[in-house]
UniProtKB/Swiss-Prot annotation:
Required to coordinate membrane tubulation with reorganization of the actin cytoskeleton during endocytosis. The gene is trip10. This is Cdc42-interacting protein 4 homolog. It comes from the Eukaryota. It is found in: Cytoplasm, Cytoskeleton; Cytoplasm, Cell cortex; Lysosome; Cell membrane. One of its GO terms (cellular component) is cell cortex. It comes from Danio rerio (Zebrafish). Its main location: cytoplasm.
Amino acid sequence: MDWGTELWDQYDILDKHTQSGLDLVDKYMKFVKERTDIEQNYAKQLRNLTKKYSPKRGSKEEQECRFSNHQAFLDILNEMNDYAGQRELIAENMMINICVELNKYLQELKQERKMHLSEAKKSQQSLEAMYKQLDNSKKRFEREWREAEKAAQYADKTDQDLNATKADVEKAKQQAHLRTHIAEDCKNDYAAQLQKYNKGQSQFYFTDMPQIFNKLQDMDERRIKKMAQGYILFADTERHVMPIIGKCLEGMTRAGTNVNARNDSMVLIEQHKSGFERPGDLDFEDYSQGINRASSDSSLGTPKGPLELLGKNKNKTFRLFNKKSKFTPEKPVDTEGFTHLPPEQRRKRLQQKIDDMSKELQKEMDQSEALGKMKDVYEKNPQMGDPASLAPQIGQTAQNMDRLRGELNKYESWLAEAGGRGDSIRYSTHSINNNGAHNPNSHDGSCTLFSPGALSDETDPSQAIYTEFDDEFEEEELATPIGQCTALYNFPGSSEGTISMQEGEVLAVVEEDKGDGWTRVRRNNGDEGYIPTSYATITLNK
């Protein structure tokens, strides 16, 4: 069953029905558009929320992230930010795959419907024109036939009139014959117009309009199928991101399970342990023996009052550092050597300072080596550059290295005084001579920074930091991993400096995120590169 056969006389109904279908497409587009606006606003609000509660760089809150419960909250914020990104992706895909496509299809349907209705209108106008011609021919035939009948009656009357002349009778008969002939022509024309109209009407109702109605039916069915696809796509768009949203939710759950209350307590101890011994018992001062009072006051080495540890009331609470404490320095606080800190914290700060300066020295040595190689290239190929132009940079790098070596030795001596570890720090780099250029006589780039206690009196500390090896040990040591990570999503690693990874792959973390959103990792085969921090779950070694 089709429209052309069953609804041949329902042109107005089909006109309204097809228009209603186009209105539905437009309505659905507006609905999806408003849905995308809601998703965009929702994602924006989620991002603002995570930004509001995320710790600012260098703030106290960021320092608190060393505790697992604080880090878990930060992980939840990161997962929420990724979740917001998925909501944005839903809105973007709905806009592109549904709204844009349906809008384009709607314009095509409007043009097609307009064309079909225009064809129907032309056929209708053509049939009406034929009917008008038929009606005119019919009226003319009717009028001429009446005139012919009148002429015939007049001729008969004239013929019977005794007073009429022969000429009058002949003239009346000729007029009647002429009218009859004209009436016959009109009759034939009317018959021809009637035949033509009947043929056109048959063509109109049995061929032209059914074809047009069937085309409208085909157009409407295609529209309905397209709408069905749009309805399915509306759900599929969100369903496609559900696995990633599930990963985000799993990450939030994982953040909660990774909280370790006992470990947080240990971190607090490690962070704030002073290293001081608890105060001992106070000696009894016998004031009843007046003669020995002065000698007792001078001989006793105990504090004259208790150490105030907790509160402000001197009679009830104690504070570790008060004005009379034997630990309070008489001179200004030495912040450079961290002598103002408790012993345990001082050792940690000194070790951290040594590690930071060691990394900085390594960078300067790498830069000096690169400048030396560049200078060699310029000397061999003058057209590539002037070797003398590198002298300022080489000199500056050498000064920086000398300064850092001196600072490093100073901090290592302080660490030794504080009872810290005195193990040396090794670097994998080629030895650098005093002017900063590459030394071709060096067998290996490894150099060892010794603490001052490890040097003899005759040894120059600035020269004793180098240790030579054989030529075959030229390869650089790999940085020690500081943790590991598990990939949450696939990452192609197509950009320079990045590395690809597959979901679930475990990689070693070499360098943590510096705030730019990238973490440096290494595979078991030695391949290194950067990955997006948000694409992996990262666990750093404690």
